Regions:
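Generic structural signal for well-ordered, non-membrane alpha-helical segments
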Residues: 17, 21, 37-41, 55-62, ...
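Conserved short alpha-helical segments that host acidic/polar catalytic motifs at enzyme active sites
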Residues: 1-166, 171, 175-210, 248, ...
Length: 400
């Protein structure tokens, strides 16, 4: 990236997959267009130039391209005849806009622009944005101008830096005590779990007769732990489903179903699709996500943030820990409302939650012991993680 059109008039950057690129490429070749690569992204650049030669208008050309392409995309498009602007578009791929003094930004994640601005807008599917130095104009799928809510990024620039650690994963492992404290402490008050940001009423909670936990990857493993805990606390059937399979399984979901969606980024494509399928069937959607203002957060009926800060390493650490904590708190909160947990068990669990950040900090203080065990085993080519019940889910996460 960027990919450039045949005559160099257009350049495109792209996250996602253009699913019908073969069909479009064959059409363009039949029109005499010469391709430089085998990528799906180049089709967008070539198609832009093809339509621009017909209509002579950058914005109109973008609209025509978007009506032809199928798949998931976050696009940034430039035209040599309009050097003062970038046009952006999204469908099923994260894209946000940053607003600065005399400058505008386009990124797939806030970590890319936090050094320059904290004022962002999250684009939704079908939207188009025109970026100039003077500002940004947003349009809906009908290409009508729209205004959207701005979000302020709360975390510090240092959260997206290594801070003296050799790599982000070690840094994020060591950040777990603080991340857990941020997720837990504001929600504990006078020995009670209090979700100020939860719209669910006790009456609504009592009305659910089925609970699904839906997620992908590590978040799915959190869901497996959640199934054990919630069934114990609520004495209700809880199903955990891989988001990629959920919408194809014809799930039994209706307006008495609570679907708990878990995602660190809030942009996981399969999880988004599962959310929309559940919502279409009438389910109430409660999401547990880390990224404020993300697509899953915006499309849910209710959202609980984990407030773990940016997680840059590929292998999850603090996001996983905070998801576990928040989901456990949800179970305890609901159990108190339903009357399915003894007062003593509830009080003990709340006390343990309050102590959890310090206990994790104490565990991470044994770095030399951890290093010793790692040195004994790191050279093995295969490892079996064996456990049952909660440890089975932990074993799956360890193997991942």
């Amino acid at each position: 990236h960027p990919h450039v059109s045949e005559n160099g008039k257009f350049a495109v950057i792209h996250n996602g997959i253009i699913e019908n690129y073969v069909e479009l490429k064959e059409f363009l070749i039949s029109q005499g267009v010469t391709f430089r690569s085998e990528t799906d992204t180049e089709v967008v650049a070539q198609l832009l130039e093809f339509y621009y030669n017909e209509c002579g208008d950058f914005f109109e050309s973008v609209g025509r391209v978007l009506r032809r392409i199928e798949g998931a995309y976050a696009l940034g498009m430039l035209c040599a005849d309009c050097p003062d602007r970038i046009i952006a578009a999204r469908k099923d791929a994260p894209l946000l806009l940053g607003f600065g003094e005399g400058c505008s930004f386009l990124a797939s994640d806030a970590t890319a622009i936090i050094r320059h601005t904290r004022d962002v807008v999250y684009m939704d599917d079908g939207e188009i944005a025109v970026l100039t130095r003077g500002g940004i104009q947003l349009y809906n799928a009908m290409q009508q101008p729209i205004e959207k809510e701005h979000h302020h990024i709360e975390w510090e620039v240092s959260a997206a830096e290594k801070g003296g650690y050799p790599h982000f994963m070690l840094k994020e492992i060591m950040e777990q005590p603080d991340a857990l404290r941020h997720a837990i402490a504001p929600r504990l008050r006078g020995g009670e779990i209090v979700f100020d940001d939860l719209k669910l009423t006790p009456e609504k909670i009592r009305g659910f007769d089925r609970i699904f936990i839906v997620a992908c990857g590590s978040s799915y493993h959190v869901g497996m732990v959640g199934k054990y805990n919630l069934e114990h606390l609520l004495r209700r059937n809880v199903e955990v489903a891989l988001a990629s399979e959920f919408r194809y399984s014809d799930p039994i979901v209706d307006d008495k179903t609570l679907v708990i969606i878990i995602s660190q980024s809030g942009e996981t494509l399969d999880t988004m699709a599962a959310l929309r399928e559940a919502k279409k069937r009438g389910a109430y959607i409660l999401s547990i996500v880390n990224v404020v203002g993300s697509s899953i957060a915006r499309e849910s009926d209710d959202v609980l943030y984990t407030w773990a800060g940016p997680e840059i390493a590929v292998a999850t650490t603090k996001a996983y820990s905070t998801q576990l904590a928040v989901l456990d708190m949800v179970g305890l909160c609901f159990a108190k409302i339903l009357g399915t947990v003894k007062e003593e068990e509830y009080a003990d669990a709340v006390r343990e939650l309050a102590l959890l950040p310090d206990k994790v900090k104490e565990t991470l203080g044994h770095c030399e012991d951890i290093q010793k065990y790692a040195a004994q085993h790191f050279h093995h080519e295969s490892v079996f993680f064996i456990g049952r019940n909660l440890d089975y889910a932990l074993g799956l996460e360890g193997s991942l």
